[in-house]
Amino acid sequence: MTPYSLLRPLIFRIPAEPAHRLTIKALGLAQGGTTLAPTPSLAQRIAGLAFPNPVGMAPGFDKNAEVPDAMLGLGFGFVEVGTVTPRPQEGNPKPRLFRLVEDRAVINRMGFNNEGAQAVTNRLVRRRETGKHGLPGIVGVNIGANKDSADRIADYALMTRLMAPLASYLTVNISSPNTPGLRALQDEGALAALLDAVIEARGNMTTPVFLKLAPDLEPADIDSICRIAIEKQLAALIISNTTITRPVLRSAHAGEAGGLSGAPLRELALQRLRDFRKASGGAIPLVGVGGIATVDDAWERIRAGASLIQIYSAMVYEGPGLARRLVAGLERKVREAGLTSIAEAVGSE
């Protein structure tokens, strides 16, 4: 039992979105805390970046880059902020975030609510230039298009030009189910055109580009995405976003529209990771996301082909100490397997 498990019933009396906002405000008071020292057996160099451990904070938690250093201070090896769009947008009508407690899951239909590129740029510039929150650490930026955009590819190109100078890496998010038509950019022709625009917009900058994908894909889609990603020399694929499918759920909010994350996504996300590992032949690094809540979950995802992992929904149920527990557990798994580096375990199942 952890201190968080004692507090959780009280926290869950607050609706999900206001509780999240209170959490961000509380973490803002902790900005500048101590980061977790690199763990030699867990450290990896991927896409030219030195990850101190493979456990990352998924986007959606810190949408506006308000608390990246506080999250690094919780033990994360990297943090991904966003999704950020060119212009501020309110997102979908509330309520739009639901805890499914009996299923240890979350349904969201947030709709890329964020303060926009200018606000996030200001925070990242301040972080870099003032040193006030200038802790070392990998902070990626997840970029998206405005819902009412007349040219979504142009939005991604603009976001690339704005964020590439400030981000450790960029993630092109075309897999949210909560922006109508967005997932169509995963189609072969649209994806190639999008990535060409992003790469052109990046210009001479070397910021790695990741691509975040949906779990609700057909085998032919997976093959074409891998081919294009390798051809365009993307740095990594993130598998996966939330799902619009609905396994058997017990919670009262099970029928809510939106993307499902947490424990019910685990098997689907794991299978899609394996599918992408097979289709890519290991030619591109993979980031495993979806339903990871325990050390065994994390280790399984690594052995299935993920070089890195990300968590979010599990934090709702397990609390802020989860990242450090996963890091300690993965270090133990590497040692028990007789390995010197977690990189040796990637894809070893």
From Swiss-Prot:
Record carries keyword Flavoprotein: yes
Cofactor(s) the record lists: FMN
Cofactor binding, per record: Binds 1 FMN per subunit.
Cytoplasm keyword on record: no
Assigned keywords, A-Z: Cell membrane, Flavoprotein, FMN, Membrane, Oxidoreductase, Pyrimidine biosynthesis
SUPFAM superfamilies, sorted: FMN-linked oxidoreductases (SSF51395)
Enzyme's top EC category: oxidoreductase
GO cellular component: cytoplasm; plasma membrane
EC numbers for this chain: 1.3.5.2
Membrane-topology annotation of the record: Peripheral membrane protein
Residues annotated to bind substrate: 63, 108-112, 173, 178, 241-242
Pathway of action: Pyrimidine metabolism; UMP biosynthesis via de novo pathway; orotate from (S)-dihydroorotate (quinone route): step 1/1
Active site positions: 176
Superkingdom of origin: Bacteria
Record PANTHER family: DIHYDROOROTATE DEHYDROGENASE (QUINONE), MITOCHONDRIAL, DIHYDROOROTATE DEHYDROGENASE (QUINONE), MITOCHONDRIAL-RELATED
Protein family (similarity comment): Belongs to the dihydroorotate dehydrogenase family. Type 2 subfamily.
Protein name stated in the entry: Dihydroorotate dehydrogenase (quinone)
Organism field: Novosphingobium aromaticivorans (strain ATCC 700278 / DSM 12444 / CCUG 56034 / CIP 105152 / NBRC 16084 / F199)
Gene: pyrD
